[in-house]
Amino acid sequence: MALNLQDKKAIVAEVNEAANGALSAVVADSRGVAVGAMTSLRKQARENGVYLKVVRNTLARRAVEGTDFECLKDVFVGPSLIGFSNEHPGAAARLFKDFAKENKDFEFKAAAFEGAVVDAEVLATLPTYDEAIARLMMCMKEASAGKLVRTIAAVRDQKEEAAA
């Protein structure tokens, strides 16, 4: 379907606005993926705060100009599905990674974070805010328990030396 100039400008503005508010972006090739699977991917994306859009390559290149994701311009070749993470930097990458496990035809092209192309696998493994807090609390808890054990052992050693 042919788009007129106004439609193209609207698409570029919409994607540019999404890119400006996003924390990270992931680009994938969705050729060969069933429509039902893509519908479920879009539903999961909405639930996880990920903006998904299939955009023509020229429009996608224009949309990312002047954003942190300008480094992705060379990736827009062939059918491209772009996902912008709005709430957590790893949300889109994690969503695409899980979807790719179920759909062998779905493949990553690239991912960007803070103005640089990064490995999508690394981006997908970033902990969420709650996971990071839980890990920090676990480390703090282990450190204090370890300190207590070392203190008790030192007191025991002192008492043994005094008795000897």
UniProtKB/Swiss-Prot annotation:
Coiled-coil annotated spans: none
Molecular function, one GO term: large ribosomal subunit rRNA binding
CDD domains tied to this protein: Ribosomal_L10
Cellular component GO terms, alphabetical: ribonucleoprotein complex; ribosome
This protein's record includes keyword Glycosyltransferase: no
Gene3D superfamilies xref list: 3.30.70.1730, 6.10.250.2350
GO BP terms: translation
InterPro entries: Ribosomal_uL10, Ribosomal_uL10-like_sf, Ribosomal_uL10_bac, Ribosomal_uL10_bac_type
Tagged with keyword rRNA-binding: yes
Keyword terms: Ribonucleoprotein, Ribosomal protein, RNA-binding, rRNA-binding
Chain's role: Forms part of the ribosomal stalk, playing a central role in the interaction of the ribosome with GTP-bound translation factors.
Quaternary structure and partners: Part of the ribosomal stalk of the 50S ribosomal subunit. The N-terminus interacts with L11 and the large rRNA to form the base of the stalk. The C-terminus forms an elongated spine to which L12 dimers bind in a sequential fashion forming a multimeric L10(L12)X complex.
Family stated for the protein in its record: Belongs to the universal ribosomal protein uL10 family.
Protein name in UniProt: Large ribosomal subunit protein uL10
